[in-house]
Amino acid sequence: MRGDERIQDEMFSCVTLEQRVPADHPLREIRGLTDAVLGSLNAEFDALYAASGRPSIAPEYVLRALLLQAFYSVRSERQLVEQLDYNLLFRWFVGLSMDDAVWNHAVFSKNRDRLLNSEVAQRFFAEVNRLAKRFMSDEHFTVDGTLIQAWASQKSFRPKDGSDDDGTNFRGQKRSSDTHRSTTDPDARLYKKSYGKESKLSYLGHVLVENRNGLIAAAMATTADGHAERDAALLMLHQRQKRGSQRVTVGADKAYDTEDFVATAHELNVTVHVQKNEKGRRSRIDRRTTRHSGYARSLSRRWLVEKTFGWLKGTGPLRQVKLRGLAKVDWIFVFSCAAHNLLRLPRLLATQIQQDPQPQCA
Protein backbone atom coordinates (compact mmCIF):
# COMPACT_ATOMS: atom_id res chain seq x y z
CA MET A 1 0.00 0.00 0.00
CA ARG A 2 1.35 3.37 -0.99
CA GLY A 3 1.94 5.76 1.86
CA ASP A 4 0.68 9.34 1.79
CA GLU A 5 3.05 12.28 1.54
CA ARG A 6 2.72 14.34 4.71
CA ILE A 7 3.31 18.03 4.06
CA GLN A 8 2.56 19.32 7.56
CA ASP A 9 5.59 19.61 9.84
CA GLU A 10 5.58 18.10 13.30
CA MET A 11 5.29 20.68 16.04
CA PHE A 12 7.35 18.64 18.52
CA SER A 13 10.16 16.13 18.16
CA CYS A 14 10.82 13.33 20.64
CA VAL A 15 14.21 12.41 19.14
CA THR A 16 17.36 13.98 20.58
CA LEU A 17 20.51 14.91 18.71
CA GLU A 18 22.32 12.14 20.57
CA GLN A 19 19.91 9.61 19.05
CA ARG A 20 20.35 11.06 15.57
CA VAL A 21 24.10 10.37 15.50
CA PRO A 22 24.92 6.69 14.78
CA ALA A 23 26.64 4.88 17.62
CA ASP A 24 29.54 3.90 15.35
CA HIS A 25 30.02 7.31 13.72
CA PRO A 26 33.76 8.24 13.56
CA LEU A 27 33.11 11.64 15.14
CA ARG A 28 31.92 10.04 18.38
CA GLU A 29 35.40 8.97 19.45
CA ILE A 30 36.90 12.23 18.19
CA ARG A 31 34.33 14.18 20.24
CA GLY A 32 35.34 12.29 23.39
CA LEU A 33 39.03 12.96 22.79
CA THR A 34 38.32 16.62 22.01
CA ASP A 35 36.37 17.05 25.24
CA ALA A 36 39.31 15.61 27.20
CA VAL A 37 41.69 18.08 25.55
CA LEU A 38 39.39 21.08 26.04
CA GLY A 39 38.85 20.16 29.69
CA SER A 40 42.57 20.55 30.32
CA LEU A 41 42.55 24.08 28.86
CA ASN A 42 40.05 25.67 31.26
CA ALA A 43 42.70 27.81 32.96
CA GLU A 44 43.86 29.19 29.59
CA PHE A 45 40.29 29.99 28.59
CA ASP A 46 39.57 31.77 31.89
CA ALA A 47 42.60 34.01 31.38
CA LEU A 48 41.30 35.21 27.99
CA TYR A 49 38.00 36.64 29.26
CA ALA A 50 36.97 39.35 31.70
CA ALA A 51 35.16 38.37 34.89
CA SER A 52 32.17 40.57 34.01
CA GLY A 53 30.40 41.77 30.91
CA ARG A 54 28.38 40.20 28.14
CA PRO A 55 29.01 36.44 27.72
CA SER A 56 30.88 35.49 24.56
CA ILE A 57 30.58 32.36 22.47
CA ALA A 58 32.09 29.58 24.57
CA PRO A 59 35.67 28.95 23.38
CA GLU A 60 34.92 25.21 23.40
CA TYR A 61 32.22 25.82 20.76
CA VAL A 62 34.61 27.85 18.61
CA LEU A 63 37.40 25.26 18.70
CA ARG A 64 35.06 22.34 17.99
CA ALA A 65 33.62 24.27 15.05
CA LEU A 66 37.14 24.97 13.71
CA LEU A 67 37.89 21.25 13.93
CA LEU A 68 34.81 20.54 11.81
CA GLN A 69 35.98 23.15 9.32
CA ALA A 70 39.25 21.21 8.93
CA PHE A 71 37.67 17.73 8.90
CA TYR A 72 35.02 18.57 6.29
CA SER A 73 36.90 21.13 4.14
CA VAL A 74 34.44 23.95 4.86
CA ARG A 75 35.77 26.93 2.93
CA SER A 76 34.79 29.85 5.16
CA GLU A 77 33.30 30.87 8.50
CA ARG A 78 30.18 32.00 6.67
CA GLN A 79 29.64 28.50 5.27
CA LEU A 80 30.56 26.93 8.60
CA VAL A 81 27.95 28.93 10.50
CA GLU A 82 25.40 28.18 7.77
CA GLN A 83 26.02 24.44 8.14
CA LEU A 84 25.78 24.68 11.91
CA ASP A 85 22.22 25.95 11.43
CA TYR A 86 20.91 22.92 9.52
CA ASN A 87 23.47 20.11 9.91
CA LEU A 88 22.46 18.02 12.93
CA LEU A 89 25.81 16.22 13.05
CA PHE A 90 27.65 19.55 13.22
CA ARG A 91 25.30 20.79 15.96
CA TRP A 92 25.89 17.65 18.01
CA PHE A 93 29.69 17.81 17.68
CA VAL A 94 29.91 21.50 18.61
CA GLY A 95 27.54 21.04 21.56
CA LEU A 96 24.47 22.95 20.38
CA SER A 97 20.94 21.69 20.98
CA MET A 98 18.21 21.47 18.35
CA ASP A 99 16.78 24.82 19.43
CA ASP A 100 19.97 26.81 20.07
CA ALA A 101 20.35 29.84 17.83
CA VAL A 102 23.47 29.86 15.67
CA TRP A 103 25.76 32.87 15.80
CA ASN A 104 26.28 35.42 13.06
CA HIS A 105 29.43 34.64 11.07
CA ALA A 106 30.97 38.02 11.94
CA VAL A 107 30.43 37.40 15.67
CA PHE A 108 31.97 33.94 15.28
CA SER A 109 35.02 35.43 13.53
CA LYS A 110 35.53 38.00 16.32
CA ASN A 111 35.45 35.26 18.95
CA ARG A 112 37.85 33.18 16.86
CA ASP A 113 40.25 36.14 16.66
CA ARG A 114 40.39 36.30 20.47
CA LEU A 115 41.73 32.74 20.45
CA LEU A 116 44.11 33.55 17.58
CA ASN A 117 45.84 36.13 19.77
CA SER A 118 46.72 33.53 22.40
CA GLU A 119 48.78 30.36 22.84
CA VAL A 120 45.68 28.16 22.76
CA ALA A 121 46.70 26.41 19.52
CA GLN A 122 50.07 25.35 20.94
CA ARG A 123 48.46 24.14 24.17
CA PHE A 124 45.74 22.29 22.24
CA PHE A 125 48.42 20.65 20.05
CA ALA A 126 50.47 19.68 23.12
CA GLU A 127 47.46 18.11 24.85
CA VAL A 128 46.52 16.11 21.73
CA ASN A 129 50.10 14.83 21.55
CA ARG A 130 49.98 13.90 25.22
CA LEU A 131 47.04 11.60 24.40
CA ALA A 132 48.92 10.23 21.39
CA LYS A 133 52.27 9.77 23.15
CA ARG A 134 52.04 5.97 23.31
CA PHE A 135 51.78 5.82 19.50
CA MET A 136 54.69 8.17 18.79
CA SER A 137 58.33 7.26 18.32
CA ASP A 138 60.74 9.25 20.49
CA GLU A 139 63.83 8.29 18.46
CA HIS A 140 63.18 8.56 14.72
CA PHE A 141 61.74 11.59 12.91
CA THR A 142 61.34 13.21 9.49
CA VAL A 143 61.31 16.96 8.86
CA ASP A 144 60.08 18.98 5.90
CA GLY A 145 58.45 22.24 4.90
CA THR A 146 55.63 23.16 2.55
CA LEU A 147 54.53 26.34 0.79
CA ILE A 148 51.34 27.96 2.08
CA GLN A 149 49.82 30.47 -0.32
CA ALA A 150 49.00 33.76 1.41
CA TRP A 151 45.60 35.48 1.27
CA ALA A 152 46.96 38.31 -0.89
CA SER A 153 47.08 38.98 -4.62
CA GLN A 154 50.09 39.78 -6.78
CA LYS A 155 48.62 43.23 -7.39
CA SER A 156 49.11 44.06 -3.70
CA PHE A 157 52.89 43.50 -4.05
CA ARG A 158 54.17 47.07 -4.42
CA PRO A 159 57.53 48.87 -4.05
CA LYS A 160 58.64 49.62 -0.50
CA ASP A 161 59.85 53.08 -1.54
CA GLY A 162 56.26 54.24 -2.01
CA SER A 163 56.45 54.90 -5.77
CA ASP A 164 53.26 55.31 -7.76
CA ASP A 165 53.31 51.75 -9.14
CA ASP A 166 49.77 50.46 -8.51
CA GLY A 167 50.84 46.83 -9.02
CA THR A 168 48.37 46.09 -11.81
CA ASN A 169 50.94 45.83 -14.63
CA PHE A 170 54.17 44.15 -13.52
CA ARG A 171 55.09 42.35 -16.74
CA GLY A 172 58.84 42.57 -17.37
CA GLN A 173 59.57 44.07 -13.95
CA LYS A 174 62.06 42.56 -11.53
CA ARG A 175 60.31 42.16 -8.20
CA SER A 176 61.53 40.60 -4.97
CA SER A 177 60.77 40.66 -1.26
CA ASP A 178 63.81 42.92 -0.78
CA THR A 179 62.29 45.75 -2.81
CA HIS A 180 58.54 45.06 -2.63
CA ARG A 181 55.96 44.33 0.06
CA SER A 182 52.34 43.26 -0.02
CA THR A 183 50.03 46.02 1.14
CA THR A 184 47.42 43.38 2.01
CA ASP A 185 49.66 41.05 4.03
CA PRO A 186 53.07 42.60 4.80
CA ASP A 187 54.38 39.33 6.31
CA ALA A 188 53.88 37.37 3.08
CA ARG A 189 56.95 36.88 0.87
CA LEU A 190 57.29 36.28 -2.87
CA TYR A 191 58.71 32.77 -3.01
CA LYS A 192 58.86 29.51 -4.95
CA LYS A 193 60.14 26.15 -3.71
CA SER A 194 61.39 24.68 -6.99
CA TYR A 195 62.60 25.71 -10.43
CA GLY A 196 59.98 26.06 -13.13
CA LYS A 197 57.26 27.11 -10.69
CA GLU A 198 55.77 30.57 -10.48
CA SER A 199 56.56 32.72 -7.46
CA LYS A 200 53.63 33.41 -5.14
CA LEU A 201 53.05 35.43 -2.01
CA SER A 202 53.51 32.71 0.57
CA TYR A 203 54.44 31.46 4.00
CA LEU A 204 56.23 28.23 4.89
CA GLY A 205 54.79 25.57 7.16
CA HIS A 206 57.17 23.12 8.87
CA VAL A 207 56.49 19.80 10.58
CA LEU A 208 58.55 17.25 12.50
CA VAL A 209 56.85 13.88 11.95
CA GLU A 210 57.66 10.77 13.98
CA ASN A 211 58.40 7.70 11.87
CA ARG A 212 56.26 5.06 13.60
CA ASN A 213 52.73 6.19 12.71
CA GLY A 214 53.30 9.50 10.93
CA LEU A 215 51.95 11.70 13.73
CA ILE A 216 53.13 15.30 13.89
CA ALA A 217 55.52 15.83 16.81
CA ALA A 218 56.17 19.56 16.25
CA ALA A 219 54.86 22.25 13.91
CA MET A 220 55.38 25.92 13.13
CA ALA A 221 54.93 28.46 10.34
CA THR A 222 57.49 31.05 9.24
CA THR A 223 57.98 33.69 6.59
CA ALA A 224 59.20 32.23 3.30
CA ASP A 225 62.92 32.45 2.48
CA GLY A 226 65.75 30.15 1.46
CA HIS A 227 66.94 29.44 5.01
CA ALA A 228 63.59 29.10 6.77
CA GLU A 229 63.19 25.33 6.34
CA ARG A 230 66.55 24.48 7.89
CA ASP A 231 66.27 27.12 10.63
CA ALA A 232 62.78 25.90 11.59
CA ALA A 233 63.94 22.27 11.58
CA LEU A 234 66.80 23.07 13.95
CA LEU A 235 64.49 25.06 16.23
CA MET A 236 61.98 22.19 16.44
CA LEU A 237 64.78 19.68 17.07
CA HIS A 238 66.27 21.95 19.75
CA GLN A 239 62.92 22.21 21.54
CA ARG A 240 62.48 18.46 21.33
CA GLN A 241 65.99 17.69 22.58
CA LYS A 242 65.53 19.96 25.60
CA ARG A 243 62.97 17.40 26.86
CA GLY A 244 65.30 14.42 26.37
CA SER A 245 69.01 13.88 25.93
CA GLN A 246 69.00 10.63 23.96
CA ARG A 247 70.30 10.59 20.40
CA VAL A 248 67.61 10.75 17.72
CA THR A 249 67.60 10.51 13.93
CA VAL A 250 65.98 12.90 11.47
CA GLY A 251 65.35 12.26 7.79
CA ALA A 252 64.94 15.01 5.20
CA ASP A 253 65.32 15.84 1.52
CA LYS A 254 68.32 17.27 -0.35
CA ALA A 255 67.60 20.85 0.70
CA TYR A 256 68.82 20.00 4.22
CA ASP A 257 72.22 18.68 3.06
CA THR A 258 74.21 21.76 4.09
CA GLU A 259 77.23 22.16 6.34
CA ASP A 260 75.58 24.41 8.91
CA PHE A 261 72.47 22.23 9.27
CA VAL A 262 74.39 18.97 9.66
CA ALA A 263 76.91 20.49 12.10
CA THR A 264 74.26 22.14 14.29
CA ALA A 265 72.15 18.97 14.31
CA HIS A 266 75.15 16.97 15.54
CA GLU A 267 75.58 19.47 18.38
CA LEU A 268 71.95 18.74 19.34
CA ASN A 269 72.73 15.00 19.51
CA VAL A 270 70.80 14.38 16.27
CA THR A 271 71.97 11.95 13.58
CA VAL A 272 71.12 13.45 10.19
CA HIS A 273 69.68 11.05 7.59
CA VAL A 274 69.14 13.47 4.70
CA GLN A 275 69.12 12.67 1.00
CA LYS A 276 72.61 13.35 -0.36
CA ASN A 277 72.94 16.39 -2.63
CA GLU A 278 75.96 15.88 -4.89
CA LYS A 279 74.90 18.05 -7.80
CA GLY A 280 77.95 20.27 -8.40
CA ARG A 281 79.04 20.02 -4.78
CA ARG A 282 80.22 17.64 -2.07
CA SER A 283 77.60 16.13 0.20
CA ARG A 284 77.95 16.64 3.95
CA ILE A 285 76.66 13.09 4.52
CA ASP A 286 79.52 10.59 4.41
CA ARG A 287 79.93 6.82 4.61
CA ARG A 288 79.89 6.86 8.39
CA THR A 289 76.18 7.62 8.11
CA THR A 290 75.09 5.96 4.86
CA ARG A 291 76.62 2.55 5.62
CA HIS A 292 74.09 1.90 8.39
CA SER A 293 70.75 0.29 7.51
CA GLY A 294 68.96 2.96 9.53
CA TYR A 295 69.91 5.59 6.93
CA ALA A 296 68.01 3.84 4.12
CA ARG A 297 65.14 3.10 6.51
CA SER A 298 64.83 6.77 7.44
CA LEU A 299 64.72 7.84 3.78
CA SER A 300 62.08 5.20 3.06
CA ARG A 301 59.79 6.82 5.68
CA ARG A 302 59.82 10.26 4.08
CA TRP A 303 56.47 9.51 2.44
CA LEU A 304 54.88 9.98 5.88
CA VAL A 305 55.57 13.71 5.84
CA GLU A 306 54.28 14.05 2.27
CA LYS A 307 51.09 12.25 3.29
CA THR A 308 50.73 14.70 6.17
CA PHE A 309 51.06 17.72 3.87
CA GLY A 310 48.57 16.09 1.50
CA TRP A 311 45.94 16.07 4.23
CA LEU A 312 46.75 19.55 5.56
CA LYS A 313 46.49 21.14 2.10
CA GLY A 314 43.95 18.82 0.48
CA THR A 315 41.36 18.22 3.19
CA GLY A 316 42.59 20.79 5.70
CA PRO A 317 42.55 24.58 5.27
CA LEU A 318 46.19 25.22 4.34
CA ARG A 319 46.41 25.22 0.55
CA GLN A 320 45.70 28.95 0.70
CA VAL A 321 45.34 30.23 4.23
CA LYS A 322 42.50 32.72 4.76
CA LEU A 323 44.19 34.65 7.56
CA ARG A 324 46.75 37.43 7.32
CA GLY A 325 49.89 37.96 9.37
CA LEU A 326 52.50 35.45 10.49
CA ALA A 327 51.10 35.06 14.02
CA LYS A 328 47.64 34.07 12.77
CA VAL A 329 49.03 31.80 10.03
CA ASP A 330 51.19 30.04 12.62
CA TRP A 331 48.15 29.63 14.89
CA ILE A 332 45.96 28.01 12.23
CA PHE A 333 48.85 25.86 10.98
CA VAL A 334 49.55 24.43 14.45
CA PHE A 335 45.82 23.95 15.12
CA SER A 336 45.39 22.12 11.80
CA CYS A 337 48.28 19.82 12.73
CA ALA A 338 46.49 19.08 16.01
CA ALA A 339 43.34 18.27 14.00
CA HIS A 340 45.39 15.87 11.85
CA ASN A 341 46.67 13.99 14.90
CA LEU A 342 43.23 13.99 16.53
CA LEU A 343 41.71 12.46 13.40
CA ARG A 344 44.30 9.65 13.44
CA LEU A 345 43.90 8.74 17.11
CA PRO A 346 40.65 6.68 17.06
CA ARG A 347 42.00 4.24 14.49
CA LEU A 348 45.28 3.87 16.37
CA LEU A 349 43.38 3.23 19.60
CA ALA A 350 41.22 0.61 17.86
CA THR A 351 44.33 -1.11 16.49
CA GLN A 352 45.86 -1.22 19.96
CA ILE A 353 42.70 -2.81 21.39
CA GLN A 354 42.76 -5.49 18.67
CA GLN A 355 46.42 -6.25 19.35
CA ASP A 356 46.11 -6.21 23.15
CA PRO A 357 42.63 -7.51 24.01
CA GLN A 358 41.60 -7.41 27.64
CA PRO A 359 41.92 -10.79 29.40
CA GLN A 360 38.56 -12.43 29.92
CA CYS A 361 37.46 -13.43 33.40
CA ALA A 362 36.92 -17.14 34.06
Model-derived features: where do they sit?
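DNA-recognition alpha helix
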Residues: 79-91
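Helix-centered, glycine/charged polyanion-binding patches within enzymatic domains
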Residues: 162-167, 254-327, 331, 353
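C-terminal extensions of enzymes
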Residues: 317-353, 358-362
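Polybasic low-complexity intrinsically disordered regions
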Residues: 85, 94-264, 277, 340
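Basic, short loop/linker segments at the boundary and entry of helix-turn-helix/winged-helix-like folds
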Residues: 23-67, 72-73
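Secondary-structure capping and boundary motifs in well-ordered enzyme cores
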Residues: 22, 26, 53-61, 76, ...
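Hydrophobic, well-ordered secondary-structure elements that form the walls
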Residues: 65, 80, 104, 207, ...
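Charged, often Cys/His-bearing segments associated with DNA-binding zinc-finger transcription factors
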Residues: 1-36, 345-362
